[in-house]
């Protein structure tokens, strides 16, 4: 059972079953109406709806059907208090066609009316101010129900008198998704976000204060249907029925929200260029350079005479530091001139008992050779050493000078 069906068919105990008496009165304030006995009753006309459809107010697109409520003056006993609020605000919103009128409504002029069920407001009728009330009709809303999500949300919305006559519409009207967003038209909308939040709601695209799906499109409207606009301002005073049915109303689609409170960090700066863009300049900078080649450019055509002169000067400098050139070792005649004797441990007077060339102890009857520095060695070991060197293996003294000085 639908909530609006409960609102019109569930009679209170004090009222008869046949009719429901509604008492209203005009209060001192221009924006409120308080209940008083005015002989108003509410009944539902099911004959106006097509066969096979039940009257509904706002529902998904697959179950859309017209819903009409007539207000008739009728005297009845057992009144039930009913209060509603009238608020006049600038009209902006999405179009609501109301081209049919049913006679029999009250002669009082009502700017607008709305109903709140369980904290949510729903519009019931939209009437032009210059005319007397003849009918209150709710036509079938074109498009799926998520085209009008603010009507089933917790925000406050009401119907208001239409703006001046709009310009004639073309033969084929654009779908509802192409209307200008409510947020751009109305600067005082309560749904504006002052912080830097961004809601990503699935495949739906935000359009002003409500979202619409790109996959669902509403039927084209006839050019003869007048357009009345629903405003987007909060309702200051409410019309409430004591029928709790919040669990029966369609809820908002649960979507996952992502919040970005801080801006993304800037991209890192590009790395500075390397000092050596290639290997060749780096390699050339590491090469040694002579004083003659230092200049703005590197010349590879060097004079051969200059190179030879430079090398010769370097050799002369080395010869001055080394002294006169001498033969590498002693000749065989020079080696034989060195004194030698047979080793006898009883008559041996030197403290040296081994050969430093072969690291062997002196034995009896071995031939020893004595160098001018008085160092003794095996004759075979030291002769071989003197053929390649001119110095003593122990003290590095010249072995060829001492004998000549002795002579």
From Swiss-Prot:
The lineage of its organism: Eukaryota, Metazoa, Chordata, Craniata, Vertebrata. GO terms for molecular function: zinc ion binding. Residues 26-58 are annotated as: Disordered. Signal peptide: none annotated. The gene is Rnf44. PROSITE patterns: ZF_RING_2. A zinc finger (RING-type) spans 355-396. It comes from the Eukaryota. Pfam families: zf-RING_2. PANTHER family: GH10160P, RING FINGER PROTEIN 44. InterPro entries: Znf_RING (IPR001841), Znf_RING/FYVE/PHD (IPR013083). Keywords: Metal-binding, Zinc, Zinc-finger. This is RING finger protein 44. It comes from Mus musculus.
């Amino acid at each position: 059972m639908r909530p609006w069906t409960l609102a019109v068919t569930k009679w209170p105990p004090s009222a008869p079953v046949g009719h429901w008496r509604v008492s209203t009165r005009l209060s001192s304030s221009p924006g409120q109406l308080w209940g008083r006995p005015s002989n108003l009753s509410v009944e539902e006309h099911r004959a106006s709806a097509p066969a096979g459809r039940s009257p509904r107010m706002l529902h998904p697109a697959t179950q859309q059907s017209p819903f009409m409520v007539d207000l008739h003056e009728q005297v009845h006993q057992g009144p039930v208090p009913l209060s509603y609020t009238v608020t006049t605000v600038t009209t902006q919103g999405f179009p609501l066609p109301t081209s049919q009128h049913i006679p029999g409504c009250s002669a009082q002029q009502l700017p607008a009316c709305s109903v709140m069920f369980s904290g949510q407001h729903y519009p019931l009728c939209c009437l032009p101010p210059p005319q007397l009330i003849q009918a209150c009709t709710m036509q079938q809303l074109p498009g799926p129900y998520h085209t009008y999500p603010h009507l089933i949300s917790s925000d406050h919305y009401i119907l208001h008198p239409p703006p001046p006559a709009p310009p004639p519409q073309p033969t084929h009207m654009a779908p509802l998704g192409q209307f200008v967003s409510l947020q751009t038209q109305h600067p005082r909308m309560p749904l504006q976000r002052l912080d830097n939040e961004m809601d990503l709601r699935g495949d739906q695209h935000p359009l002003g204060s409500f979202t619409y799906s790109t996959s669902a499109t509403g039927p084209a409207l006839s050019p003869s249907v007048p357009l009345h606009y629903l405003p987007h301002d909060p309702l200051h005073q409410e019309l409430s029925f004591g029928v709790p049915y919040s669990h029966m109303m369609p809820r908002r689609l649960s979507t996952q929200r992502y919040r970005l409170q801080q801006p993304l960090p800037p991209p890192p700066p590009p790395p500075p260029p390397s000092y050596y863009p290639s290997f060749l300049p780096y390699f050339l900078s590491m090469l040694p350079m002579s004083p003659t080649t230092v200049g703005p450019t590197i010349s590879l055509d060097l004079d051969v005479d200059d190179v030879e002169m430079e090398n010769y000067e370097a050799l002369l400098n080395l010869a001055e530091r080394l002294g006169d050139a001498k033969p590498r070792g002693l000749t065989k005649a020079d080696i034989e001139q060195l004194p030698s004797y047979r080793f006898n441990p009883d008559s041996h007077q030197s403290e040296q008992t081994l050969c430093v060339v072969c690291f062997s102890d002196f034995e009896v009857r071995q031939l020893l050779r004595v160098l001018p520095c008085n160092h003794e060695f095996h004759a075979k070991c030291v002769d071989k050493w003197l053929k390649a060197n001119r110095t003593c293996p122990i003290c590095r003294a010249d072995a060829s000078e001492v004998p000549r000085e002795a002579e």
